[in-house]
């Protein structure tokens, strides 16, 4: 018997929906969609969610909810880094409740890391039995979890993401042309400092990347726009992709096959964090 659950997830850069049948042994994803909403735009400077980012996120939530309405037995709405930090998070949460009739749950960094880890291991069942690390680079934070079963034994959340790093080093966006070497060096130093907790982690047999930065790098390397699942990425792959982005101005980045235009300004920051 089918038992479909739906989730709407509000990230710093994107809002996503997922519909899955959880009645089977291995949950089966039946529909998934992502819309670039960037609710975290300007949050680092003001400490608040802006009116325009909130409204476009609410519009996206309504659009995603319409597409899956009637196909699930229960709907969950969650949010991550931007809502953890925003002074007016409760105001936005109330607007979501009014829109959907469902409470918004703001995940802690540790809960987010655990969810990314379990999702990755469920999708890539062949990884089970090894000690695996899962690194999820988002728009506002970066999560890491490791373990050898579906329950991670170590989770870390770091306060850095692709949107936050780009806003901290605006030249990374490429609006004025190629990114200066000084800006890249500054971004690497910021990332290195924020990610210090990861340097202390126990070695793993395999490291899996999840999130928009890693999947977009895979799209670009394969030269395609269709979904990439379980695509191997080496440090050389990441560096080659980063070099290409850093040398291109923003308008030219938007024409790269596999790169969604709304992610063109923040992808270099995301790759710097991954690397």
Where are the model-predicted features located?
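N-terminal basic/disordered segments at the start of proteins
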Residues: 1-28
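Helical "lid/coupling" subdomains associated with nucleotide-phosphate turnover
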Residues: 3-5, 19-22, 38, 42-71, ...
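Acidic active-site catalytic centers that drive phospho-/nucleotidyl reactions
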Residues: 9-11, 112, 136
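Short flexible coil/turn linkers enriched for glycine and charged/polar residues
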Residues: 11-13, 71, 98, 138-140
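Structural motif
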Residues: 14-16, 141, 214
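Short amphipathic
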Residues: 31-35
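A generic, well-ordered mixed alpha/beta core segment in the N-terminal half of proteins
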Residues: 133-141, 145
């Amino acid at each position: 018997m089918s038992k479909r659950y739906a989730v709407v997830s509000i990230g710093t850069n994107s809002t996503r929906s997922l519909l899955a049948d959880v009645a089977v042994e291995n949950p089966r994803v039946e529909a998934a969609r992502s819309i670039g909403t960037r609710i975290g735009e300007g949050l680092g400077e003001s400490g608040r969610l802006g009116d325009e980012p909130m409204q476009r996120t609410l519009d996206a939530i309504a659009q995603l909810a319409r597409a899956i309405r009637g196909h699930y037995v229960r709907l969950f709405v969650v949010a991550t880094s931007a809502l953890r930090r925003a002074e007016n998070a409760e105001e936005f949460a109330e607007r979501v409740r009014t829109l959907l009739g469902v409470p918004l749950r703001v995940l802690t960094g540790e809960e987010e890391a655990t969810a990314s880890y379990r999702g990755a291991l469920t999708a890539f069942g062949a990884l089970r039995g090894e000690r695996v690390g899962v690194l999820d680079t988002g728009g506002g934070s970066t999560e890491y979890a490791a373990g050898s079963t579906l329950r991670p034994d170590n989770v870390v959340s770091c306060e850095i993401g692709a949107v936050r790093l780009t806003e901290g080093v605006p030249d990374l966006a490429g609006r004025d042309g190629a990114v200066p070497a000084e800006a890249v060096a500054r971004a690497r130093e910021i990332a290195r400092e924020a990610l210090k907790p990861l340097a202390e982690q126990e070695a793993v047999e395999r490291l899996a990347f999840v999130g928009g930065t890693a999947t977009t790098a895979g799209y670009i390397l394969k030269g395609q726009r269709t979904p990439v699942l379980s695509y191997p990425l080496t440090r050389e792959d990441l560096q080659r992709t980063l070099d290409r982005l850093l040398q291109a101005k923003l308008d030219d980045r938007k024409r790269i096959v596999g790169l969604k235009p709304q992610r063109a300004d923040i992808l270099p920051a995301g790759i710097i964090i991954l690397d």
